[in-house]
Amino acid sequence: TKPEFDFVFRIKKERYLVMSYLNNQLGYRDALLDTRSIIKKGDYIVLDPDGLVKNVVPGYENCDVTILGSSAMGATFADYLVHVHEGGKNTGIGGEGIESFLYVVDGELSVKNDDQSAELTKGGYIYSPASNNITFEAKGEATLYVYRRRYEPVAGHSAHTVVGNANDLEWMSYEGMENCYVQDFLPSAHDIGFDMNMHILKFHIGASHGYIETHVQQHGMYFLSGKSMYRLGDDWVPLQKGDYC
């Protein structure tokens, strides 16, 4: 187990293909079927990668797409885990009132929107405002986290395209705690043109949140490494690399 963990922070209904494809656990098993996944619609969900399925989502070509959070689960956003094969691409994510965000978990690919284009490597990301969509194309294999949400505007303010890489960002102590750190990807803390944020939190052994967050905002979290116990609603839930909640 690594001594720390990180996580980041959106179709047609019955269209899915292969189950449990992420860990190659296909066919019959020797034990009774079980899962760590928890579905409490309107409260929280935990998705164990062992049970994730491939979905058919328009616009993705030569990609394995798994829907994570969605309105069907009670979320105000939708996010996806995307495994891109050689030559895989998307013809347009977001736009027409939908803001979008793409993060490269592994691999590299070319991305662009109406404002700019970039070559993203592991840790790279692009945020695209609701007026633009993101397209991407990969020359090799890549794993992506993709997020979509209907933008909530504030009069006189607007969001803009942001491109960067987590490896170029400074780790900041999280709320003054020296064993917990954060990297913010978007300037939402001081620019109300951005109606949401994306960040990575890093917890060393023994670190935790300073309090149990109680608020109206929703989170989507994908765990990049490590293991932890996380308080969700009234429950303490074990979470680890590859989990989503």
Per-range role (PLM):
Residues 21-72:
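An N-terminus-focused feature that recognizes amino-terminal "leader" regions
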Residues 84-86, 104, 128, 138, ...:
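Hydrophobic residues in beta-strands and at strand termini
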Residues 85-89, 122-125, 129-131, 204-206, ...:
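Tight coil/turn sites that cap or link beta-strands
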Residues 53-92, 173-212, 217:
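A short glycine-rich, His/Asp/Glu-containing loop-to-beta-strand
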Residues 63, 75, 116-117, 130-155:
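Ligand-binding loop in jelly-roll beta-barrel domains
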Residues 21-26, 139-181:
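Double-stranded beta-helix
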Residues 89-122, 214-243:
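A short beta-strand-loop-beta hairpin characteristic of the jelly-roll/cupin
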Residues 1-23:
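N-terminal amphipathic/basic-hydrophobic helices that include classical n-h-c signal peptides
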